[in-house]
Amino acid sequence: MKDTCIEIKYRDKVYHAYFNLNVMEQIQDEFGTLQAWGDMTTAGEEPNAKAIITGLMYMINEGIEIDNEDNGTKTKPITHKQAGRILTELGLEQTAQQINGLVVDSVSDDAKNE
């Protein structure tokens, strides 16, 4: 597994959404398994809004923590409602595809972070 990141632009901010073991653990705690969460967020049938919003929140908050550590900043984590607003503006289906792609890229790569 390798840390993977996408940029999410919302209004005047750019968020880095990460998928790594920390996010994987949070998703497993909330939804049981990564597979169960993935089934809820896959495009096709109606995606589970709570699953997508929660996953996006975990990923953005991990990015905020990493940026805070790397840059000595003190940006506050986003809330569930803020993640929902971001998702609403960006589009549910498009964002679901992006975050599912992020997860697939991370877990399909056996390389370590360098």
Q: Where are the predicted features?
A:
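Short strand-coil-strand connectors
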Residues: 11-13
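Short linear motifs in exposed loops
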Residues: 18-19
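Active-site- and interface-proximal helix/loop "cap" or "latch" segments in soluble metabolic
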Residues: 47-49
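Short, hydrophobic/amphipathic alpha-helical patches that form generic packing surfaces
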Residues: 51-62
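N-terminal targeting peptides, primarily Sec-dependent signal peptides
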Residues: 64-66
